[in-house]
Amino acid sequence: MSSKLLSMKFMQRARGIDPKQAEEELSKNIVTDEHWSLAGKVDFLPQKMTRNVEYESGYGGLIEENDLESHSNEPNLVQGRASFGLFNKELGEENVDEKDVSKNEEVDVNGTKITDTSELTERERRKQELVSKKAEASRKMEVKAPAKESKKRKVNELSQDVISLHSPKESNARKTKKNKNKKKKKRN
């Protein structure tokens, strides 16, 4: 090493300390991850608290417990959706019919059940109207479709649809002039 490097302060300090003594100082200052402490405070090692934890997949157990507490006199109902859209038509129709019947039943003063059929007929009437409207719309579409395909416009007719300052007579006169000019060019 050079003399300038050896004359620096940190090099002089390193010379004066014994290597064993330096290792001891380093080992005292090493902090392990196992135990941290604050100066001036007594460390109390926390005792491990044990917890009894039960794990269940899903919320089914929680829902059942809450239902038993709040609705103990009601029968167990099936949770979840049994049908969606057109997946299970029979089950969906049964549920709708059961709801309609329960709405239509009224208890008379004597305790006998009276069913109101006016709502059922109203429902059937609405369904028939909807079916007839769909049938009419499909017939109209069938009638309109051939008419569109039967008549095709010519290119000359389309050019007259374009808005212009010239009348149709003037446009015909122009066409004849153009045709004459073309014939002259062909002759030359």
Curated annotation (Swiss-Prot):
Residues 174-188 have a biased composition (Basic residues). GO terms for cellular component: nuclear exosome (RNase complex); nucleolus; nucleus. GO terms for biological process: maturation of 5.8S rRNA; nuclear mRNA surveillance; polyadenylation-dependent RNA catabolic process; RNA catabolic process. It is found in: Nucleus. The keyword Acyltransferase does not apply. Pfam families: MPP6. InterPro entries: MPP6. Its main location: nucleus. Residues 120-149 have a biased composition (Basic and acidic residues). Keywords: Nucleus, Phosphoprotein. The modification Phosphoserine is found at residue 167. Residues 93-188 are annotated as: Disordered. It comes from the Eukaryota. The keyword Nucleus applies. Associates with the RNA exosome complex. Belongs to the MPP6 family. RNA-binding protein that associates with the RNA exosome complex. This is M-phase phosphoprotein 6 homolog.
